[in-house]
A protein has these predicted regions:
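Compositionally biased, intrinsically disordered low-complexity regions used as flexible
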Residues: 1, 178, 274, 868-878, ...
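Conserved P-loop NTPase motor core
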Residues: 1-612, 617-631, 684, 705
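Generic detector of short, well-ordered, non-transmembrane alpha-helical segments enriched
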Residues: 3, 392, 445, 493-494, ...
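Extended, charged helical/alpha-beta scaffold domains that provide interaction surfaces
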Residues: 33, 321-329, 335-343, 572, ...
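Proline-rich low-complexity regions
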Residues: 113, 220, 408, 710, ...
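Short, Lys/Glu-rich amphipathic helical modules
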Residues: 444-457, 691-692, 746-751, 895
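Hydrophobic, well-ordered secondary-structure elements that form the walls
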Residues: 449, 497, 797, 833, ...
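Short Cys/His-rich zinc-binding micro-motifs
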Residues: 886-903, 907
Length: 908
């Protein structure tokens, strides 16, 4: 705590004091609602809605609504919100971030603001990090909402548009951040409003808000289709890159003369970049038989070479990615989980595939994209929950205008956080780590060992096997067992090695997890997985088989809870869960996420980090000075140093990296804000067309503007008729406005004419053609206008996205010309946007004036779509996305990947 906090009290303490009267008002109503019968309590929802309709605000009814929800939770779920959980609910309702420690019941806290805000009828989105949690919480907490008369929806991948539409129409919708974002993008690719699924962005509660809004902020959501580029060049570039010699440096100095460097490319370990040197460029020119790598004609080759050296010099197997079943799969740097379905952009993924000699996929074409930053900033009110947000408080304020309020724990925190032990070498560090693990195992204290990569977790596993210490390894390679391993990490004598924060979201309970043991017992009894899923689910059902399975599961759960209780006492007696960090992460928040796994709900626990000056963080950010100091002091490699100087140095290094990443995320946002403004313009215009606004007037205006623009382009000087290029103007409009004999005048006629006269003649011809088309197609023409306009908007918008990406890729060089790259990107980007708008006008008018009906086809509303290349879901297809898949049968595996049959999952 800083001096200011000691003198004036922390910001969180002051904010909690401010809302205390509201908390007391909620608690004071406990007896009132406890005395209500079920029917009266359930009727409160309708009463609250009537009060809102009569002019009351959500804040006015908050105490009563929270108290009613609190009582209902006790009756339906068997859980009553603690006072600190009521505090958390108020913070979330106010559109802020509530920092709550692990095990404090964030899932239950969200029910209070979700219920209150759902009463407005505008919808509430509860955002989770994965589909399992979304599905679980929608069923579990959904029982509470449904009991109180609200509807609950679930939006996850694999659902049909009709299922999604029903989910978003519900009062409260659960889903993942990815699915909410993708549904937004898909809604802005449809041709008919009936194909849209979302209905607005009123209020979102984001679980693990730091993971979604900070960690994933630099990863845009992209809907893509197959590109047309060949993959051969990736393999050729990789074969060339394999012949090059790299030079690894901690940090590259831009002032260094690269001509003197005797290496082919430089790997900057701090910035994680690879840069080809003049020597490397000369080798490339010789290898590919070109005159200059910097020639504009060789930009594509240069890009492939740059990605190939990045794949070989920067990206490391089993750290940044794994190769599994012939596929390159990204490893999440923050959680250690496999990111199935995600791919690096700009050809980097293909470069890694070429390096690893697996099938190189075609580079995808971006059809629609948005960052999480800009998606979540669309909500009228945004709130979040996490156990670790305070270190990122400034970023939440600057980017999202969210403040972080730290909530106290319901029970006093009994965890002991020991000082870091810093060793001179990694050998000394690992020796100490093995000793600590062995000591914990000997006294049967469970220990969770956190590592920063798959490679390091497997190295520690190998050393433990040599010592004969039984253990479990949890990393991206074994993610299928993640929840099971983490759930049992609190058993006496359990040794669990985990990369980063794998298993986050699964509580580690002292003594073991009774629910997992009960599930395991069901498996041993031969129960099918889908029935086990139903037995442990919370959804309403009348199926007798499922009801019997649930009753049996509850019996087993009761039995194992009784067996685990003395085991939990044993673990508490030896100090609770021991958390051992083997390396400091670049972010203090990730370190804190490891720490908070211990000491849940007042349990004892211990945390300690054992690090060395040879670790990447220390080596790249200030370790040399400390290494020299230790050498001068004659410190042995097996002697730990625990000093404030070292702790300050580590925190300083982390703060510098956090600042660097913050600047990178801000920079991403600066560029995306340019695209976002353009996206808002395009999507708002699209929405007006979808909403049924007549486009005929817009089409006529497009004709007039396009003709006027063309006339001014070809007839530059109003007075100098000799410079008029009437032939060029005629050729440009030939076949859809003009014909061969149009715009041919005698010299005398021409002298009397102005540009407005020419424009008037052309507009008259265009109007004539337009009216003829309306007569030809009859009532169907208005529908054709809509579809043609949307098709051209979508097609050219996709091209524009690609063009903007190319512009961004090269804009950084403007800095060398004393030009702000972001300003240059904004100015040139809007010039390109204007050109795209002109293209939309030309293509739309041209198509509408030349389109012809198919012979013997009655032009019905649905049939107008077919010649215009729209998909079954109503989206315009620029390029083929995928072959249409056959709908799964009821007994087929569900395409969402849950492992259940389709009839038991998304086919319900």
């Amino acid at each position: 705590m800083g001096l200011a906090d000691k003198l004036f009290g922390s910001y969180s303490a002051k904010e909690l004091k401010r809302i205390r009267p509201q908390v007391d008002a909620v608690l004071a109503l406990e007896d009132h609602y406890r005395r209500m019968d079920n029917k009266t309590l359930q009727g409160e929802t309708a009463r609250f809605k009537e009060q809102l309709a009569a002019g009351k605000t959500l804040d006015d009814i908050l105490p009563e609504a929270f108290a009613a929800c609190r009582e209902a939770a006790d009756r339906v779920l068997g859980m009553r919100h603690f006072p600190v959980q009521v505090m958390g609910g108020i913070i979330l309702h106010q559109g802020r971030i509530a920092e709550m420690k692990t095990g404090e019941g964030k899932t239950l806290v969200a029910t209070l603001p979700a219920y209150l805000n759902a009463l407005s009828g505008k919808g509430v989105h509860v955002v989770t990090v994965n589909e399992y949690l979304a599905r679980r919480d929608s069923e579990w907490m959904g029982n509470l909402y449904r009991w109180m008369g609200l509807t609950v929806g679930l939006a996850v991948s694999g659902m049909s548009p009709d299922q999604k539409r029903a989910a978003y129409a519900a009062d409260i919708t659960y889903g993942t951040n990815n699915e909410f974002g993708f549904d937004y993008l898909r809604d802005n690719m449809v041709v008919y409003k009936r194909n849209c699924v979302q209905r607005g962005w009123n209020y979102a509660i984001v679980d693990e808000v730091d993971s979604i809004l900070i960690d994933e902020a630099r990863t845009p959501l992209i809907i893509s289709g197959a590109g047309e580029k060949s993959t051969d060049l990736y393999e050729k570039a990789d074969r060339f890159a394999a012949t090059l010699t790299p030079l690894r440096v901690k940090e590259m100095d831009a002032k260094d003369d690269q001509e003197d460097i005797r290496a082919d490319y430089i790997v900057d370990e701090k910035a994680r970049t690879a840069t080809i040197t003049p020597q490397g460029a000369r080798k490339a020119e010789q290898y590919f038989g070109i005159e200059s790598l910097n020639d504009p004609d060789n930009l594509t080759l240069a890009h492939h070479i740059n990605q190939a050296i990045a794949a070989r010099g920067v990206m490391q197997r089993d750290i940044d990615y794994v190769v599994k079943d012939g596929e390159v799969i990204i490893v999440d740097e923050f959680t250690g989980r496999l990111m199935i379905g995600r791919r690096y952009s700009n050809g980097l993924h293909q470069a890694i595939e070429a390096k690893e000699h697996v099938t190189v996929a075609r580079e995808n074409r971006t059809l629609a994209t948005i960052t999480f930053q800009n998606y979540f900033r669309m909500y009228d009110k945004l709130a979040g929950m996490t156990g670790t947000a305070m270190t990122e408080d400034q970023e939440f304020r600057d980017i999202y205008r969210l403040d972080v309020v730290e909530l106290p724990t319901n029970k006093p925190l009994a965890r002991q956080d020991l000082p870091d032990a810093v060793y001179k070498t990694q050998r000394g560090k690992y020796s100490a780590i093995l000793d600590i693990i062995a000591e914990c195992y000997s006294r049967q204290q469970p220990i969770l060992v956190g590592t920063t990569s798959i490679e390091k977790s497997e190295m520690i596993s190998k050393l433990l096997r040599a010592r004969g210490v039984p253990h479990e390894v949890l990393n991206a390679k074994f993610h299928e067992k993640e929840a099971e391993i983490v759930a049992q990490a609190g058993k006496p004598g359990a040794v669990t090695i985990s990369t980063n924060m794998a298993g986050r979201g699964t509580d580690i309970m002292l003594g073991g997890n009774a629910e997992y043991l009960a599930k395991d017992a069901l498996r041993r009894e031969g129960m099918e997985e889908e029935l086990i899923y139903e037995a442990t689910a919370y959804g309403e059902t009348q199926d007798e088989e499922i009801l019997a399975a649930r009753a049996h599961f509850q019996e087993l759960l009761k039995k194992y809870k009784a067996e685990i209780a003395p085991e939990a006492d044993k673990v508490r007696a030896v100090g609770g869960l021991y958390i051992l960090g083997t390396e400091r992460h670049e972010s203090r928040r990730i370190d804190n996420q490891l720490r908070v796994r211990a000491g849940r709900q007042g349990d004892p626990g211990t945390t300690k980090f054992v690090i060395s000056l040879e670790d990447d963080l220390m080596r790249l950010f200030g370790g040399e000075r400390l290494q020299t100091l230790m050498d001068n002091m004659g410190v042995d490699e097996n002697m730990p140093i625990e000093a404030k100087l070292l702790s300050n140095s580590i925190q300083s290094a982390q703060a510098r990296i956090e600042g660097m990443h913050f600047e990178m995320r801000k920079n991403v946002l600066k560029y995306d804000d340019v695209m976002n403004r353009q996206r808002e313009i395009i999507y708002s215009q699209r929405r007006r067309v979808l909403d049924g606004e007549s486009v005929s007037d817009s089409i006529r205006k497009m004709m007039e503007e396009y003709i006027t623009s063309s006339v001014h382009q070809y007839l530059v000087d109003e007075k100098n008729h000799d410079e008029w290029n009437l032939d060029g103007l005629r050729d440009r409009l030939m076949g859809w406005i003009t014909e061969e004999n149009d715009l041919r005048f005698s010299p005398e006629e021409l002298r009397r004419m102005t540009r407005d006269d020419i424009a008037g003649l052309l507009l008259e011809k265009a109007e004539g053609r337009y009216n003829a088309q309306r007569e030809l197609f009859g009532d169907a023409f208005e529908e054709i206008e809509r579809v043609v306009l949307l098709r051209n908007v979508d097609t050219l918008w996709m091209d524009h996205i690609d063009a903007m990406e190319e512009l961004k890729r090269g804009i950084g060089l403007r800095g060398y010309a004393q030009q702000d790259p972001v300003v240059a990107y904004r100015l040139e980007g809007f010039e390109m946007f204007d050109q795209m708008i002109e293209g939309i006008k030309e293509n739309t008018v041209r198509m509408l004036l030349t389109i012809r009906p198919r012979p013997q086809v009655e032009m019905k509303r649905e049939q107008t779509m077919k010649p215009l290349a729209t998909g079954e879901d109503g989206t315009v297809k620029k390029v083929p996305m995928k072959a249409d898949k056959k709908k799964p049968g009821r007994n087929d595996p569900c395409p969402c990947g849950s492992g259940l049959k389709y009839k038991k999952c998304c086919g319900k």
